[in-house]
Amino acid sequence: MGRVRTKTVKKAARVIIEKYYTRLGNDFHTNKRVCEEIAIIPSKKLRNKIAGYVTHLMKRIQRGPVRGISIKLQEEERERRDNYVPEVSALDQEIIEVDPDTKEMLKLLDFGSLSNLQVTQPTVGMNFKTPRGPV
């Protein structure tokens, strides 16, 4: 069974990762030495706890973004994703099929002037079977 990590350990590990991400890795012993060099940690026990949590977070960061930690590389990647513009606009198609409700919404948003809209009746959803037997 694991132990609960204190606020001090978590905060220190996050700050260390944000500032010294390039010097850290997945190895506890190297992370321990880096923590020892860059921070004034009062006890050996606390240093080991921080280094252990740094190692844990580094493994999580490799799998994907971690909440509460902003790293320059991840920030740039997020910017690229947010600023993505498709090659061909969805509005440049010859005919855009929409249902009557969507047509009304487009009219309210001042897109009613689109000439290539074609109103079609929506297809009825799938026929789900009613449950049999006692409920």
From Swiss-Prot:
Modification sites for Phosphothreonine: T130
InterPro entries named among the record's database cross-references: Ribosomal_eS17 (IPR001210), Ribosomal_eS17_CS (IPR018273), Ribosomal_eS17_sf (IPR036401)
Pfam families: Ribosomal_S17e
Covalent link location (Glycyl lysine isopeptide (Lys-Gly) (interchain with G-Cter in SUMO1)): K103
BP term (GO), one: translation
Main location: cytoplasm
Cross-link Glycyl lysine isopeptide (Lys-Gly) (interchain with G-Cter in SUMO2): where in chain: K103
Post-translational modification: Ubiquitinated at Lys-103 by RNF14 and RNF25 in response to ribosome collisions (ribosome stalling).
Residue numbers carrying N6-succinyllysine: K19
The keyword rRNA processing is assigned to this record: no
GO cellular component: cytoplasm; cytosol; cytosolic ribosome; cytosolic small ribosomal subunit; focal adhesion; membrane; nucleolus; nucleoplasm
Record-listed Phosphoserine modification sites: S113
One of the record's GO molecular function terms: structural constituent of ribosome
Compartments where located: Cytoplasm; Nucleus, Nucleolus
Domain of life assignment: Eukaryota
Keywords from the named record: Cytoplasm, Diamond-Blackfan anemia, Isopeptide bond, Nucleus, Phosphoprotein, Ribonucleoprotein, Ribosomal protein, Ubl conjugation
Disease entry from the Swiss-Prot or TrEMBL record: Diamond-Blackfan anemia 4: A form of Diamond-Blackfan anemia, a congenital non-regenerative hypoplastic anemia that usually presents early in infancy. Diamond-Blackfan anemia is characterized by a moderate to severe macrocytic anemia, erythroblastopenia, and an increased risk of developing leukemia. 30 to 40% of Diamond-Blackfan anemia patients present with short stature and congenital anomalies, the most frequent being craniofacial (Pierre-Robin syndrome and cleft palate), thumb and urogenital anomalies.
Family stated for the protein in its record: Belongs to the eukaryotic ribosomal protein eS17 family.
Described purpose of this protein according to its UniProt entry: Component of the small ribosomal subunit. The ribosome is a large ribonucleoprotein complex responsible for the synthesis of proteins in the cell. Part of the small subunit (SSU) processome, first precursor of the small eukaryotic ribosomal subunit. During the assembly of the SSU processome in the nucleolus, many ribosome biogenesis factors, an RNA chaperone and ribosomal proteins associate with the nascent pre-rRNA and work in concert to generate RNA folding, modifications, rearrangements and cleavage as well as targeted degradation of pre-ribosomal RNA by the RNA exosome.
Assembly description: Component of the small ribosomal subunit. Part of the small subunit (SSU) processome, composed of more than 70 proteins and the RNA chaperone small nucleolar RNA (snoRNA) U3.
Protein name in UniProt: Small ribosomal subunit protein eS17
